[in-house]
Amino acid sequence: MSQIDQSFGTPAIIIRPYSGTTGPGSIAANSNTEVNATSQPVDVNDQGWVMFYPGVTPANNVRPGTFRCTTAGTAIISWNNPTAGALTPTAPTATTPYLFVIVKSGL
């Protein structure tokens, strides 16, 4: 598993790539859409953000969704869309990966 571990004392910040090439699909306007993403590089009690590319102008704008993990390998992701219209993010690819920013305490 590829990862970058950067410790700033406690807690530690760990960045890992999202596994797979399926995005959240359409996110309704002014809402959070919660999904269970399986086969992800997360452990029980992990929490933090998922950075994703919304695929709107500007194309490289990155937005965060939050996640938590209660079962190893499954990220419960809340994809956030604060805009007035529905949002269909660009699916993750090798050049535009989604990234987990995991906050670990007690390391």
Describe the role of every protein-language-model region.
Residues 51-57:
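A sequence-level detector for low-complexity, Ser/Thr- and acidic-rich stretches
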Residues 63-96:
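Structured beta-strand segments within beta-sheet-rich domains
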Residues 15, 59-65:
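Surface-exposed loop/edge segments in extracytoplasmic proteins
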Residues 43-47:
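Extended extracellular/luminal ectodomain segments enriched in beta-structured repeat modules
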Residues 1-42, 80, 90-107:
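Extracellular receptor-binding modules and their adjoining Ser/Thr/Gly/Asp/Asn-rich linkers
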Residues 37, 48-50, 67, 75-77, ...:
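Hydrophobic beta-strand residues in large extracellular and virion-surface proteins
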